[in-house]
Swiss-Prot record:
UniProt source species: Xanthobacter autotrophicus (strain ATCC BAA-1158 / Py2)
Family recorded in the similarity comment: Belongs to the class-I pyridine nucleotide-disulfide oxidoreductase family.
EC number, as in UniProt: 1.8.1.5
Record text about domains: Contains three domains, the FAD binding domain, the NADPH binding domain, and the dimerization domain. The binding of the substrate induces a conformational change that results in the sequestration of the substrate at the dimer interface.
Function: Involved in aliphatic epoxide carboxylation. Catalyzes the reductive cleavage of the thioether bond of 2-oxopropyl-coenzyme M (2-KPC), and the subsequent carboxylation of the ketopropyl cleavage product, yielding the products acetoacetate and free coenzyme M.
Protein name (record): 2-oxopropyl-CoM reductase, carboxylating
Keywords: Disulfide bond, FAD, Flavoprotein, NADP, Oxidoreductase, Plasmid, Redox-active center
């Protein structure tokens, strides 16, 4: 084992990126990055097993509180799989999907090229991501060492001995606590042929795609991952078939919003087959996928393809640690924790995707910080709930709180404010209109593509219960709007805000149109 003692070396961000790339490309697995303060005599308050979002943010918080921490991670960089082959790549792919939908909609018009029969390379975009991903890795290694003064051992899987002891880089480290932050991996499918060449998940797509897929893509799954990648594949000009076991995008609770999203996907040519179960993946003589067979409500369906994408969620990486430490697990393999993020084993905490859903960045980062605070003596609970949510299709879809049907079922007398309004022209009006949707709003026959937005309000209390937006640019606002809604935001207070016109969300000005009414009615 070759170990680079990096403690007294001070690399720039670019130097870090180059070093990481060299380690990743090394045929022997590369050197261990050893950044440990041997002059600090204190016992570690916590060793973080994993340096992804939960481990890195938790470490930074613990260090800021005056504690001593150590991260041990199998990757040669901090930040985990998210910026390497998980959540960040699809943002690039979704940018491409939005641009391509615009270009295809206005094909041959204005300055747009003729996109008829144009097929865009999937591998070309994947290669673009691969070539640029080490820059962010370099930033995180640099920032964590030079600015946050974190201790870490990277490119070195941790060997957990017990609830206070970890072996790494040929040395044994002791800590008062362990914080497990090893994340989750892609879900899989238990059918014949699933290991054929040409069957990918989000990680192997980035790491292993070495050919340009043919004219048909099959996506298995119907939630975030499946939809986000599926829309990208569709936008490249390929037939895209989604095989969904139940119904797609059930996480969008408002039926009208969900219907708008699915209608736009289908309008782009996506084939969504609900109630389907894949029974086998057929291989050719060379072990490469040649077809997918599924049982659908209309009987058996066989789809010829050389490219299958599994968008089946995430599975916590809990098995090995559970066996070593005796951790209690939940039905989906998640490590069970209490409100203080403590596991069933004394002095062992678990955070991030390892503890199950929601498998979101905010939960990873916050749970890491809350675990650190508990380790440092605070008695503080964390249970993620009532959070805003988001996904990509060809659009950006943001939502929070209650949908209309959910609010009615809960006993609320509700009114809604939405754009476009319910009219005889339906969606075929030039509103909503804002950044990135103006061409759709004013284009001939494309007004219905300019987006959809809606807020749900309790007519008696005047409080905003939920908000839903399909378009572009609203995600950032939803982060803050969610806090205000949890604090009891009313339609009157919303209407009294200052909009930055033309704002992606029209909620402020539309609320102002109704706020003067003693008895609220829908708009």
């Amino acid at each position: 084992m070759k170990v680079w003692n990096a403690r007294n070396d001070h690399l720039t961000i670019n130097q870090w990126a180059t070093r990481i790339d060299e380690i990743l490309e090394a045929p022997d697995g590369g050197e261990v990055i050893y950044n440990v303060d041997e002059n600090d005599p204190r016992e570690y308050d916590a060793i973080f097993i994993g340096g992804g979002a939960a481990g890195r943010f938790g470490s930074a918080y613990l260090r800021a509180m005056g504690g001593r921490q150590l991260i041990v991670d199998r990757w040669p960089f901090l930040g985990g799989s998210c910026p390497h082959n998980a959540c960040v790549p699809h943002h690039l792919f979704s940018d491409c999907a939005a641009e391509l939908m615009l270009a295809r909609t206005f094909s041959g018009q204005y300055w747009f090229p003729d996109m008829t029969e144009k097929v865009v390379g999937i591998k070309e975009v994947v290669d673009l991501f691969r070539a640029g991903r080490n820059g962010p890795h370099g930033i995180m290694n640099f920032q964590s060492k030079e600015q946050l003064n974190l201790e870490y051992i990277l490119n070195c899987p941790a060997k957990v001995i017990d609830n206070h002891t970890v072996e790494a880089a040929g040395k044994v480290f002791k800590a008062k606590n362990l914080i497990l932050a090893v994340g989750a991996g892609p879900g899989t499918l238990d059918v014949p042929g699933v290991n054929a060449k040409g069957v990918f998940d989000h990680a192997t797509l980035v790491e292993e795609l070495d050919y340009e897929p043919g004219s048909t893509v099959v996506v298995v799954g119907g939630s975030k991952t499946a939809v986000e990648y599926g829309c990208f594949f569709n936008a490249t000009g390929r037939r895209t078939v989604m095989l969904v076991r139940t119904e797609p995008l059930k996480l969008i609770k408002d039926n009208e919003t969900r219907a708008y999203v699915l209608d736009r996907m289908k309008e782009q040519g996506m084939e969504i087959i609900s109630g389907s179960n894949v029974t086998r993946i057929e291989e050719d003589a060379n072990g490469r996928v040649q077809a997918v067979v599924a049982m659908t409500p209309n009987g058996e369906m066989r789809i010829e393809t050389d490219f299958v994408f599994l968008g089946l969620g995430e599975q916590p990486r809990s098995a090995e640690l559970a066996k070593i430490l005796g951790l209690d697990l939940g039905p989906k393999g998640e490590v069970l924790v209490n409100e203080y993020l403590q596991t069933s084993v004394p002095n062992v905490y678990a955070v991030g995707d390892l503890i199950g859903g929601p498998m979101e960045m905010f939960k990873a980062r916050k749970s890491g910080c809350y675990a650190a605070r508990n380790v440092m003596g605070e008695k503080i609970s964390y249970t993620p709930k009532n959070y805003p949510d988001f996904l990509h299709t060809h659009y950006e879809v943001s939502f929070l709180g209650m949908g209309e049907e959910e609010a009615r079922a809960a006993g609320h007398e509700i009114v809604t404010i939405k754009m476009p309004p319910d009219t005889e022209n339906g969606l075929n009006v030039a509103l909503p209109a804002s950044d990135r949707t103006m061409l759709y709003a004013f284009g001939k026959g494309t007004a219905h593509m300019s987006g959809f937005q809606k807020i749900v309000i309790d007519a008696k209390t005047r409080k905003v219960l939920g908000a839903h937006h399909v378009g572009y640019g609203a995600k950032d606002a939803f982060q803050y709007l969610n806090v205000l809604i949890k604090q009891g935001l009313t339609v009157d207070e919303l209407g009294d805000m200052d909009e930055l016109f033309l704002n992606p969300t029209h909620f402020i000005q539309l609320s102002r149109l109704r706020a003067g009414s003693k008895n609220l009615v829908s708009l």
